[in-house]
Amino acid sequence: MTGKKRSASSSRWLQEHFSDKYVLQAQKKGLRSRAWFKLDEIQQSDKLFKPGMTIVDLGAAPGGWSQYAVTQIGGQGRIIACDLLPMDPIVGVDFLQGDFRDELVLKALLERVGDSKVQVVMSDMAPNMCGTPAVDIPRSMYLVELALEMSRDVLAPGGSFVVKVFQGEGFEEYLKEIRSLFAKVKVRKPDSSRARSREVYIVATGRK
């Protein structure tokens, strides 16, 4: 019975995925993923990126966000990206493969950032979902807390933080914490984010 349910669920997901207009557009444009469009929508509304910026990209693979951001920051900008999964090279992106939760990986990431502060920390990290909110939400909240901690360590005053969060237990407390650290905080649900998904994007600007 369980196998049939998983098979049906997987079939629905695949059908939805390959008929998704943003997936089709991404394939047509040669983009790494549909996530490119989510960040584009956020940039249109919140103007996070400017030429010459330094950015940290967490949960970067397969590279949709980094691929978009390099078009906004130009040749003088720099992106330090990290993911557990491999990612094909992108010009202007310094990629570190490893588990962000591992202290050695975190140390290596901070070494790549160096002494200079960054202007944007962005996180599209998500755990491997099992479909049970009581398990998935705490796993997700742990990752977004780590991303926020990273932003505290490396963001310059006035810097920005954008993070994918799955709504559920702990969301309001997390949002409150971010509001204490940034001058302006918005919760975005891009059109390119699937309607039935719990995901939203917190966009925080003006690091205090």
From Swiss-Prot:
Keyword Oxidoreductase: no
Catalysed reaction equations from the record: uridine(2552) in 23S rRNA + S-adenosyl-L-methionine = 2'-O-methyluridine(2552) in 23S rRNA + S-adenosyl-L-homocysteine + H(+)
Gene (UniProt): rlmE
Keywords linked to the UniProt accession: Cytoplasm, Methyltransferase, rRNA processing, S-adenosyl-L-methionine, Transferase
The EC number(s) this enzyme carries: 2.1.1.166
Homology family: Belongs to the class I-like SAM-binding methyltransferase superfamily. RNA methyltransferase RlmE family.
A GO cellular-component term linked to this record: cytoplasm
CDD domains tied to this protein: AdoMet_MTases
A UniProt-annotated Pfam family: FtsJ
Location in or out of the cell: Cytoplasm
Catalytic residues (positions): 164
Name of this protein: Ribosomal RNA large subunit methyltransferase E
Binding site for S-adenosyl-L-methionine: 63, 65, 83, 99, 124
Function statement: Specifically methylates the uridine in position 2552 of 23S rRNA at the 2'-O position of the ribose in the fully assembled 50S ribosomal subunit.
Gene Ontology MF annotations: rRNA (uridine-2'-O-)-methyltransferase activity
Domain of life per record: Bacteria
Main location per the UniProt record: cytoplasm
Top-tier EC class: transferase
